[in-house]
A protein has these predicted regions:
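Helix-loop-helix
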Residues: 54-55, 60, 159-173, 243-316, ...
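Membrane-integrated ABC transporters
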Residues: 1-37, 52-67, 85-89, 93, ...
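An intracellular "coupling" helix at the cytosolic face of ABC transporter transmembrane type-1 domains
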Residues: 17-18, 113-114, 130-139, 143, ...
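Short intracellular "coupling" helices and adjacent cytoplasmic loop segments at the cytosolic face
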Residues: 2-3, 94, 102-126, 130-132, ...
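ABC-type nucleotide-binding domain
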Residues: 330-331, 337-586
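Transmembrane helix-loop-helix hairpins at lipid-water interfaces of multipass membrane proteins
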Residues: 23-81, 161-166, 277-281
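Alpha-helical segments in transporter systems
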Residues: 21-46, 67, 71, 86-90, ...
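Membrane-embedded alpha-helical segments of multi-pass transporters/permeases
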Residues: 38-42, 83, 87, 153, ...
Length: 586
């Protein structure tokens, strides 16, 4: 994609809009601070010469005091300039990172479901949190420093060569030889910082995966194997962090050694020049200050470039995420559903998650208004895929899906989503009160309706046993069984009161008694709604108006339970095998 080929600077520009003035003021404050830093030693030189010339007669105390007072004033101004540029740079960088986070949040909502199916949650979360934070912290620590130090080095060079080219040459050559040596290390550090961010994402993803599946890991006695895998990933992260931080940490001591070496050379060469009468003592004193001023920003530049490389690696991952292909823009689609009856028609639908592999083949079926339609079949038959297409989570490759005669391709995704209530196999409840969970993103839901829906699915009594009833906050202190969580999600779907209903494995994780309660409530409350039920337990869908039997992405049988049993085909074999298994279990 074009965005991925763009430079980081070009990709960053939209997020810097409106911050240019603050950055300009920070830049000017940096220039002022550097001018003061460079100008100070020239006045110190004058002060030293005044004192040295007055040793044989008398020191001009008034002149020395005037220079001292002047230096105090300009150094205070320099201090304020430093604070101003640091404040403005920090503010701009934090605003930049805030905009990045906002862009990522908007991006998540515009990505197709296929992206999340193909990427681990840990990797995505690492880009949203760790990478943005790393970029912000690294930029905050280095951007102002590198800019200020670069300008300072330039100003010091001009001043030193204007004062004495011999001492200036000694300072520059001795310092740059060491800096060239350091640049070799910096060239290798970029790859290590990139590996650090990737390895951190891998560790986050693995921890999230093992935490969410902790019960399975424990039941299979796989704790030791997961420890070994984590140890491998953790050691890889340790290795990449160690390498990047070792190179980062060694630069400052090297540059300090170079600074001290240059300092000694300036004193030796300066003393020789002074003995020959070529320079004054004041120039030596000034150059002693300039050596420190010159070598320190070079050290800071080396350290800052390392941080910028770390920021570059992190921002590269963030912009890679922001450049992912989004869902189709549907702002031009205006078809809406009104006075819905609930008829759904699949007309020769074909679909594949990848272009080279078709999952659903020429699928056709009709669900009349108010019917209960069950979709059954072995694992991998395409049942859940049909629901994903029905909800427009994915775009179909061929054919059409029509709701009350309107092709879903002509409607916005939000319009299709509003037409459905949905209970997924994966239970999702957020940290908030039970009431907030039940009326999620819906307005005008009264407490009476909340209680009515809860009673309909048999969860009201349990809720009232909790200390705060419907105001109980669902967090780590509240323990709910899988069945209770599922009942809450079913009540939430019922409160939405949409004309179409999808139940994906809705009762597969509850006990028999709870399943019976749910089934009775569903049968009563699904009246007048077109319902699609996916269940591996065929006993739960015997009263369906239409059963679609799928295998390898095709409908191989359809009819009601009695008709399909009379055919003695694939459905009958599935049903009889489950019935036999249930008897054996009993």
């Amino acid at each position: 994609m074009e965005n991925k080929k763009m430079s980081l600077w070009k990709q960053s520009k939209p997020y810097l809009a409106g911050l240019q003035f603050a950055l300009l003021i920070a830049f000017l404050a940096t220039i002022l601070s550097n001018i003061i830093t460079v100008y100070g030693p020239t006045r110190i030189k004058e002060m030293t010469n005044i004192i040295a010339s007055g040793l044989e007669t008398s020191v001009d105390v008034a002149a020395v005091a005037a220079i001292g007072a002047f230096l105090a004033v300009i150094y205070v101004i320099g201090l304020l300039s430093n604070y101003l540029q640091a404040f403005l740079f920090t503010t701009a960088i934090q605003r930049f990172s805030e905009r990045l986070r906002r862009a990522i949040a908007e991006k998540i909502n515009s990505l197709p479901l296929g992206y999340f199916d193909g990427h681990s949650q840990g990797d995505t979360l690492s880009r949203v949190t760790n990478d943005v934070d790393t970029a912000a912290q690294s930029l905050n620590q280095s951007l102002g420093t590198v800019l200020s130090s670069s300008l300072l080095v330039l100003a010091v060079l001009v001043t030193m060569f204007g004062m004495n080219w011999i001492l200036a040459l000694v300072t520059v050559v001795s310092t740059l030889v060491g800096f060239a040596f350091v640049s070799v290390f910096m060239g290798k550090s970029q790859g290590f910082f990139k590996s650090q961010q990737q390895d951190l994402a891998a560790v986050n993803g693995y921890v999230e995966e093992m935490y969410s599946g902790h019960n399975v890991v424990t039941s299979y006695n796989a704790i030791e194997s997961t420890k070994e895998e984590f140890a491998t990933l953790n050691h890889r992260l340790y290795d990449s962090i160690w390498k990047s931080q070792f190179i980062s940490g060694i630069m400052m001591p090297i540059m300090m050694f170079i600074g001290n070496f240059s300092y000694a050379l300036v004193i030796i060469v300066g003393a020789a020049l002074a003995l020959n009468g070529q320079i004054s003592i004041g120039i030596i004193v000034a150059f002693m200050a300039y050596v420190r001023i010159f070598s320190q920003p070079l050290s800071q530049i080396a350290q800052g470039i390392t941080s910028l490389q770390q920021a570059s690696a992190a921002m590269g991952r963030v912009f890679e995420f922001l450049a992912e292909e989004e869902m189709e823009d549907e702002s031009h689609k205006e078809r809406q559903l009104s006075d819905m009856k609930g008829q759904v028609v699949f007309d020769r639908v074909s679909f594949g998650y990848t272009p080279d592999r078709t999952i659903i083949h020429d699928f056709s079926a009709t669900a009349h208004a108010g019917q209960k339609v069950a979709i059954v079949g072995p694992t991998g038959a395409g049942k859940t895929t049909i629901v994903n297409l029905l909800m427009k989570f994915y775009e179909i490759d061929k054919g059409s899906i029509r709701i009350d005669g309107i092709d879903t391709k002509e409607m916005k995704r939000s319009e299709v989503h509003d037409a459905f209530s949905m209970v997924l196999q994966d239970i999702w409840l957020f940290e908030g009160t039970i009431r907030d969970n039940l009326i999620y993103n819906q307005e005008g839901i009264s407490d009476e309706r909340v209680i009515e829906a809860s009673k309909a699915v048999g969860i009201h009594h349990f809720i009232m046993t909790l200390p705060d009833g419907y105001d109980t906050v669902l967090d780590d202190t509240v323990t709910l069984s899988v069945g209770q969580k599922q009942l809450l999600t079913i009540a939430r779907a019922l409160l939405k009161d949409a004309p179409l209903l999808i139940l994906d494995e809705a009762t597969s994780s509850v006990d028999t008694r709870t399943e019976e309660l749910i089934q009775k409530a569903m049968d009563r409350l699904m009246e007048g709604r077109t319902s699609f039920v996916i269940a591996h337990r065929l006993s739960t869908i015997r009263n369906a108006d239409l059963i679609l039997v799928m295998k390898d992405g095709n409908i191989i049988e359809q009819g009601n339970h009695d008709e399909l049993m009379a055919q003695a085909g694939f459905y009958a074999d599935l049903y009889n095998s489950q019935f036999t298994e249930d008897e054996v279990e009993e």
